[in-house]
Amino acid sequence: MDQLQIKDLEMFAYHGLFPSEKELGQKFVVSAILSYDMTKAATDLDLTASVHYGELCQQWTTWFQETSEDLIETVAYKLVERTFEFYPLVQEMKLELKKPWAPVHLSLDTCSVTIHRRKQRAFIALGSNMGDKQANLKQAIDKLRARGIHILKESSVLATEPWGGVEQDSFANQVVEVETWLPAQDLLETLLAIESELGRVREVHWGPRLIDLDLLFVEDQILYTDDLILPHPYIAERLFVLESLQEIAPHFIHPILKQPIRNLYDALKK
């Protein structure tokens, strides 16, 4: 992909763990590579399809100096986060933050951290069977947007019977396709935080819930950890999930089963 490179932007700020760093301040140096499609900007002279690197450098300087953080990891992360927020056309970003005056009392050129993130497509299943179900789904989607997660597509809301054998009210279910620069684990933690904010209490496994947010796919990632399994292990067994998926992404290929969603839906429906 096309790349914009900004190298060694110098800024003076008051980041650091030691009191002297927060009182006296020091120099920091930022370099970054931003990846996005430059075709439209290059061929049509369309400035809206480009990143104004002068304005970006000014924004970085302002953002960098408006707080005093203990760790340079925090500052670097915030620069990446806000760059993605202000420049939606950026698809990938690699940022290095150097701290040449780091108080290590030894001879060195610099200390630095590098953060590398890229946007990914993900699919999230939403469900609710308590209170105003459709309003709960809408609130969850609004909270995703508020966290900088771009909603690409929304399926219709389906009324479905509960899954898992626990007697309870019917569900309102939906699937959304999103674009986010958050890694899969961070995206999962975001979903859990939204559930908590909306009042979900985990008491009965597969029991009633005010809101349920399940991470189905993140691109074609295959992942197995104590906290997260990708793809979601029950996709091929849940007709309501497949029905919503095939509405918005019928040709998406399940990375383990190697079949498009449309085929999985047709097979389970029979």
Swiss-Prot record:
One of its GO terms (molecular function) is ATP binding. Its EC number is 4.1.2.25, 2.7.6.3. CDD domains: DHNA_DHNTPE (cd00534), HPPK (cd00483). GO terms for biological process: folic acid biosynthetic process; tetrahydrofolate biosynthetic process. Mg(2+) 2 binds at D212, D214. Residues 120-270 are annotated as: HPPK. ATP binds at residues 160-163, 171-173, 192-195, 200-215, 227-233, 238-240. Transmembrane segments: none annotated. Residues 1-119 are annotated as: DHNA. Gene3D superfamilies: 3.30.1130.10, 7,8-Dihydro-6-hydroxymethylpterin-pyrophosphokinase HPPK (3.30.70.560). Keywords: ATP-binding, Folate biosynthesis, Kinase, Lyase, Magnesium, Metal-binding, Multifunctional enzyme, Nucleotide-binding, Transferase. The keyword Mitochondrion does not apply. Disulfide bonds: none annotated. SMART domains: FolB. InterPro entries: Dihydroneopterin_aldolase, FolB_dom, GTP-CH-I_C/QueF, Hppk, Hppk_sf. Substrate binds at E21, Y53, I72, E73. It catalyses: 7,8-dihydroneopterin = 6-hydroxymethyl-7,8-dihydropterin + glycolaldehyde; 6-hydroxymethyl-7,8-dihydropterin + ATP = (7,8-dihydropterin-6-yl)methyl diphosphate + AMP + H(+). Pathway: Cofactor biosynthesis; tetrahydrofolate biosynthesis; 2-amino-4-hydroxy-6-hydroxymethyl-7,8-dihydropteridine diphosphate from 7,8-dihydroneopterin triphosphate: step 3/4; Cofactor biosynthesis; tetrahydrofolate biosynthesis; 2-amino-4-hydroxy-6-hydroxymethyl-7,8-dihydropteridine diphosphate from 7,8-dihydroneopterin triphosphate: step 4/4. In the N-terminal section; belongs to the DHNA family. In the C-terminal section; belongs to the HPPK family. NCBIfam families: folB, folB_dom, folK. This is Bifunctional folate synthesis protein. It comes from Streptococcus pneumoniae serotype 4 (strain ATCC BAA-334 / TIGR4).
